[in-house]
Amino acid sequence: MSRAFVNEDAGAAPERYPLPARDDPGYPLAAARALLRGADVGDTPGAEAATGLYFGDPALKREVEQILAESQEDGNERLEQLAERFLRRVARGRA
């Protein structure tokens, strides 16, 4: 078999979205940040898999509203745009 098809030298995939334990009180905010980061880099499916939540999940509405306020205060227009997009999805459901 060609070495091109052998993955024996591959290591574990690097952790793209480091998150605290799910029972950690900071998990929802960290998950919201991970989902927004994933959307920013074009890896929404990876962020959703890492968090177990989806982009626009109403369970994270409060956290994303907090991130939106922070981004507006900091002048981070890209993060503001992503947070607003997330909240629009919350408002209309997962569709």
Features from the language model and the residues they span:
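Long, non-catalytic architectural segments outside compact domain cores
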Residues: 1-63, 74, 85-95
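Solenoid-repeat scaffolds in large eukaryotic assemblies
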Residues: 79-80
